[in-house]
Amino acid sequence: MIKKILVTGSTRGIGLSVAEKFHSNGWNVCLNGRNQDKLMEISERLNKERSNSALGVKADLSLNSDLNTLSEMIISQWGTLDCIIFNIGSGHGSKGFASTMEENLASLKTNFLDVVKSSNKLCKLLSQNQPSSIIFIGSIAQDSNVNAPFSYAYSKKALNNFARYQAIALSKQKVSVNVINPGHILTEGGVWARKKQESNVEFNNFVSENIPVQRIGTSEEVAEFTYMLVNGNSNKFITGSQINIDGGTSINIK
């Protein structure tokens, strides 16, 4: 039987790489994002590779109406899911104590509360007849000083704690719940691509001083590990865990 996965935030970056990785290994993929044109472009490309293997559902998961639309579309097309990847969040915001209360509340909503709401709704779509998985994409900023906005860091920390409790709550339903915390990842159009373009020298200096493996990570590496975590022989026994994919950055904080 073909397995089915929902990947939120999957029109670019880590989310897209994860969706492509699972699709290339025979999974049917539900793509989600807010850019209808990108969703159509990607789903059409994947369906050319394997017919009827990809859905593209435009939905802003901060909106209850869109969350319901996404849920109803999956139910009508597939019935159930075998895995959900929650790739939701934004690292925008003022650094340190310069952030306003409005920024703090907005970050908490985007990076934590909207994810919790989406997970509580969509976890009901997971198969009841066999083991299934939820993976949250977090950030090493949740417990490492990587100069991220405070609000982003503590929102991701809250997400890690939520995942631990959800892992306990869903354990009897054979649902594993884990968090993957990427470090500095180079993605097309992302912050590190921009910094590299602005000053390749400063970019290389940062990498050599802060990342022990002496290079920045790729979204494909995050996708590779995500797939392994879901499909590995020991995945049924891994739950409530958080795994850093950061080239050693989080243990090299000065």
Task: List the predicted regions and their residue ranges.
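Short, small/polar-rich loop/turn modules that mediate ligand/substrate recognition or access, typified
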Residues: S171, S176, F237-T239
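A glycine/serine/threonine-rich, flexible loop-to-helix segment
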Residues: K172, I185-N210, I253-K254
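Short C-terminal tail/terminal secondary-structure segment
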Residues: N233-K254
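Conserved glycine-rich cofactor-binding loop
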Residues: T11-R12
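Conserved glycine-rich Rossmann-like NAD(P)H-binding loop of the short-chain dehydrogenase/reductase
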Residues: N25-I42
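Conserved mid-core segment of classical short-chain dehydrogenase/reductases
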Residues: N68, G89-L105, A148-S151, V191
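Catalytic loop of short-chain dehydrogenase/reductase
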Residues: S133-K172, H184-I185
